[in-house]
Amino acid sequence: MNEGNGFASKSGMTVSIENSSPVISAVTDSSGNFTLPLDPSLHSFALVYTKPGFGTFKRYYMRDASNKIYYVDNNSPYQTENASESLGSKSTVTINSFSASIIGDALRLTSNISSPNASGEKYIRILYQKDLPGISINTVDKTKTNWSHLLPVTNGDNSFDVCLACSTICADWKPGDKIYLAAYGDSFYSNMYQDQTTSKIFLPNLNPNTNVIPVSIIVP
């Protein structure tokens, strides 16, 4: 996929078994299909999906006692027949300015963005966290339910209102809370995944280049 919701070429994606030595990998064909030889003695493994200009994605798998393979998501096994990957491209969006303010019963988010792509879908990811002055993609607590959300944008100025009383984003905010916010360019398909070894959550398509510092609001 491109950085929006549009299709890109299905060919040329490299799929490899993580930590295999020698490296076991395959490249997708024009239909997006690939074949990997798998050692029958391998009971758990991760597949790594990469393509130039696209974010890296990992998916974890396990083999049960009956030799059936499942993929693992949020510590739960699922049948591989239901597994499909949509690899998104990296975001081209740079945040030039970002602000947040309370307007009536809404949180107004305004931004100015630039991208070399004049047309096509573009998105920014807004981060939220209470009492975190240095909020960034590296410091925000990604285990929280409402730590971020994605907004569509166009080159230039953008404005978006979030209902304080009805949005799930604000569900655990209380009057007087100081909420810190930051913004980054991201893609519709963020390729977000949690590393099973470190438990860290990664957003491979996020553009870390932002020209603005975090902002804050006081919940009325």
Feature locations, PLM:
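Short, ordered, surface-exposed loop/turn motifs in non-cytosolic proteins
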Residues: 3-19, 40-42, 120-123
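A short, amphipathic beta-strand motif
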Residues: 1-4, 32
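Short, acidic Ser/Thr/Gly-rich low-complexity loop/linker segments typical of extracellular
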Residues: 21-33
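Structured interaction patches on ligand/partner-binding surfaces of diverse proteins
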Residues: 54-82, 191-205
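A short, solvent-exposed beta-strand micro-motif common in secreted/extracellular proteins
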Residues: 42-63, 184
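Ser/Thr/Gly/Pro-rich, low-complexity flexible regions
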Residues: 99-220
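Extracellular beta-sheet/turn segments enriched in Thr/Pro/Gly and aliphatic residues
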Residues: 65-99, 213-220
